[in-house]
Structures are given as C-alpha cells and as structure tokens.
Curated annotation (Swiss-Prot):
Organism per entry: Pyrococcus horikoshii (strain ATCC 700860 / DSM 12428 / JCM 9974 / NBRC 100139 / OT-3)
Function: Catalyzes the synthesis of GMP from XMP.
Protein name per the record: GMP synthase [glutamine-hydrolyzing] subunit A
EC code(s) of this entry: 6.3.5.2
Record's keyword terms, sorted: ATP-binding, Glutamine amidotransferase, GMP biosynthesis, Ligase, Nucleotide-binding, Purine biosynthesis
Active-site annotation: 79, 166, 168
GO CC, one annotated term: cytosol
HAMAP family associated with the record: GMP_synthase_A
Residue span, Glutamine amidotransferase type-1 domain: 2-189
Classification via Pfam families: GATase
Higher taxonomy: Archaea, Methanobacteriati, Methanobacteriota, Thermococci, Thermococcales
Subunit structure: Heterodimer composed of a glutamine amidotransferase subunit (A) and a GMP-binding subunit (B).
Ribosomal protein keyword on record: no
Amino acid sequence: MMIVIMDNGGQYVHRIWRTLRYLGVETKIIPNTTPLEEIKAMNPKGIIFSGGPSLENTGNCEKVLEHYDEFNVPILGICLGHQLIAKFFGGKVGRGEKAEYSLVEIEIIDEDEIFKGLPKRLKVWESHMDEVKELPPKFKILARSETCPIEAMKHEELPIYGVQFHPEVAHTEKGEEILRNFAKLCGEL
C-alpha cells in the first residue's frame, strides 16, 4: 500500500518523497528502469513520474501507460513526467517561448480533484526548457499561465494527471496540498 515514484533523474525527486512521507504516505523511489512485473508486485496505489533531463531517458514510464489497465491507479506526471504523458497520448511537446527557471503564476481553470480547495491563482516553481504545446486527445486543461498554455492537465476518463511545475518544491504555493490531494485520490489519506 504505497505510492511509487519513478525516478527520471530530476533534481527534486527526494523532495516528492519527503513531502509525501511528511503527510504520512508510504512512498518509495524506484529507478525508471524497474521492470513492470516488479512494479506490479509492489501493488502501488498511485504512481508518480518525476521530472528529469530528457524524454529519451524515461525508462519504463511509457510501458506503465501502455499497460495502464493492469495497474488502474492514479498517475501524476511532474514536469518531464507531464510531457511524457502528453506525448504518449498524442499531444505535442516542444521548446517553450523561453526556458523557465523561476516562480510563475498559474491560473486554475478547472480544479478537478488535484486542485480541490485551492485558490484560483498560485505561484509555482518551474524549471524546464520544453513544455506541452498541444493537448493530447481526451485530455482537458486544468491550469495555464501567461507563458505556458498547458500548466496542468487531466485525462477525461482516467485519473491521469500532469503538471508542468514542481509541487514538491518549497517555493510552490500550496504544493503540499496538491500532493495531498493526489494521495487522497490514491486512497492513501
């Protein structure tokens, strides 16, 4: 009974783990090369795809999406994980107008479960060059900013979410609440 974080080599992976542990959620970081059978044997209640440097180095994250019906749990993609989900489902990923390594104000346009109870505007920490340029079919936009039109998205039928920013970083307003909402979706809180 835990949430599994698939490590794509991002600098903030341990902060995701630390935040969830602080909330009382059993959490485990695993290499993104972990075989599907091993991940299934862990019986995760939720899966997080961490940020990282490159879409070419996301290991078995795509395989988890390919075999989603065998897991059937909420998934949250953060930064690179968000882009990976978009690309897998037929969206387009490309260079942003400018590289973002700063606080950005996002506007929540659909709170869904992940932003439940949060203010409509939040300052969040971004650290990326690429972004989702075109929403995949069957996804809806949950949040946007002036520089990035797809800051957060969700599959219309499945509990699969992506956020371009880093909820696990202290600079992000209400980041802990976003991760708490995800853990609730997973039945872990």
